[in-house]
Amino acid sequence: MNDFVFLVVACLLTAGTEGKKDGYPVEGDNCAFVCFGYDNAYCDKLCKDKKADSGYCYWVHILCYCYGLPDKEPTKTNGRCKPGKK
């Protein structure tokens, strides 16, 4: 009985919550957003427009990186960028 009550409480606490993730936001073609000139303001705005908490230009890859993206927002995977394929 105690296990059942614990399970119900755990389900109620997690119901309706949306997780957040960090990563490189992409379009449908698995191409990340390039930030020429290391433009942190551009990346921060791009990330916030995608409902992330914040973002910056990761200078090593010259790509925008976001913190706190919604789970439904696509992020870069190991596959190659395929421009034009959405």
UniProtKB/Swiss-Prot annotation:
Domain of life from the UniProt record: Eukaryota
Alphabetic keyword roster: Amidation, Disulfide bond, Ion channel impairing toxin, Neurotoxin, Secreted, Signal, Toxin, Voltage-gated sodium channel impairing toxin
SUPFAM superfamilies on file: Scorpion toxin-like
Chief site of localization: secreted
Signal peptide: 1-19
Pfam families hit by this protein: Toxin_3
Biological processes annotated in GO: defense response
Annotated localization: Secreted
Domain spans labelled LCN-type CS-alpha/beta: 21-82
Tissue: Expressed by the venom gland.
A cellular component annotation (GO) from this entry: extracellular region
Keyword Ribonucleoprotein: no
Disulfide bond listed as a keyword: yes
Cysteine pairs bridged by disulfides in the record: C31-C81, C35-C57, C43-C64, C47-C66
GO molecular function: sodium channel inhibitor activity; toxin activity
Positions of post-translational Proline amide modification: P83
InterPro entries: LCN-type_CS_alpha_beta_dom, Scorpion_toxin-like, Scorpion_toxin-like_sf, Scorpion_toxinL, Scorpion_toxinL/defensin
Family recorded in the similarity comment: Belongs to the long (4 C-C) scorpion toxin superfamily. Sodium channel inhibitor family. Alpha subfamily.
Domain comment quoted from the record: Has the structural arrangement of an alpha-helix connected to antiparallel beta-sheets by disulfide bonds (CS-alpha/beta).
Record's function text: Alpha toxins bind voltage-independently at site-3 of sodium channels (Nav) and inhibit the inactivation of the activated channels, thereby blocking neuronal transmission.
Protein's name in the database: Alpha-toxin TbTx5
